[in-house]
Structure formats: C-alpha cells, structure tokens
Amino acid sequence: MFFVRNKILKLISFVVPKFCVDFFFKLFSLLNGRGYQPSLATEVHYCLKKLGYVPKNFIEIGVHHGDYTKEVLKKIPACAVYLFEPSLVNFAIIKKFIKRKIKKFNNIKLFNLALSNVNKKQKLFYDKKGSSMSSLSKRSFQNKFEIVQVRRLDTVFKKIKLDRIDYVKIDVEGYELNCLHGFGNLIKKVKLIQFEFGHTYVDQRKYFRDIYNYFNKFNFDIYIITPKGLILIKEYKENLEYFIFSNFVAINRNN
C-alpha cells in the first residue's frame, strides 16, 4: 500500500502544486493509520473485538487521569484492573475517582509507580503539573521534575498471580520499549497490548524496528489502528518509521 502511495504521489507531483502533494501524502498516511488519533472508545472497541473474549484483567501503564480506563470499565466493569501512574498530581486525581466509585468498582488496584526495565528511583520530567506528557526521558520543553519510584512489572507481579494477562495499555511517552523489557517472562502470558509510536521515540533514539523485533521475538502480530479498523503489519519496512503519533495493537499468537 505504501509503495502504491509513493507512485501515485510521484505522478501527482508533476501536475499539481507542492501543497496538494503534501495534502495527498497526509491523507494517504491518515487512511493507513499514520497520525490517526481515534476516540478512546474506538480504541477500546477495536481491542476488545480483536481479543475475541471478555478479559478477566486489564493493566494500564501511564494512566494520566484515567480516561482510557473509564472507557474500559464501561465495557467490562467486572474485570480486575491494575493501574500504574507515577505523577503525584495525576495519582491523586485517579485515587479520587476510584474512591468516588469504590462501591461500583471494587476491583481496581492503583500503584504510584513508573514501570521500566529497572528497580530504582528516577526523575520524572514534565512541563507543568498534571501534564499528560510526563516522561522518564527529558525533552527540551520539560524544565521541571519529581523523583518517582520505578519498578519492573515482573517485580510488582511477583505477589500477583495471574494465569494470563488479557489486556494491556501502555502510554509512557517514548519509554514503551524499556517498559516492555521490564515484563521479563511475563510477556509470554500477555494476550494483547495497545501502544503508541511517534515523535517521543526520537528522544529515546528508538525506532519502530526495535518495537517490531521485540514483539516478533515473542510471537506477537502487530496491527495499526486505522479509520478502516485494524490492519496487520505483515513485515517490517523502513517506511514504518513514521514519527507522528499512531496507535498499534500487538496480539500474542501463542495464547
């Protein structure tokens, strides 16, 4: 599809102004999921549809104010929920929501932790309190920080025994690969993971190739979320290195 797009754009460039070529490039990219930002309800819908069964548990890593989790709970209110948010401001907001809904949702565990591939304290950088772009990796516009506890997921889950981890959402501003390495052997128990790829990976010097190779090693298929639904990425190609926020779903072929 991408090679067809490039041929079409090359032909168009001979007969139309550059701004039109740019428009068609963005349109083709968007239709194939590049830079496509669906609603949270749409993301959850696609994940549950691809999962094919009602999940017993859900993990969100990088919760912010909990909007994604709220959409999940609308669909599967009885599942066990594990939430990880390192920011004290955001943690307080989520905690308030849970306390308010505790009679309805008594199945939520909240952790004031960042998840990565190490167990230690680190700086969490942000531009303003409560920012959705807080990150363990400092970016040029982030001039503030707080010290947070960082843990590996396999360390946290030593005391939480799950036969299978059904549904995971990761949004950690470019730290996704570090976070995934912290799963250790738990990754083999995971059925589905939704994650983002975009310009935050530039700061980490990470590429889609790195994410692809990680999931491929553990027999996951990767799909990109598009306006037309999920499209399977059959093999890695360099044109996947598109540093505009896009959403992906990885699903384990083995369980």
Regions found by a protein language model. Give the residues of each.
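Phosphate/nucleotide-binding beta-alpha loop and adjacent structural elements of enzyme active sites
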Residues: 1-255
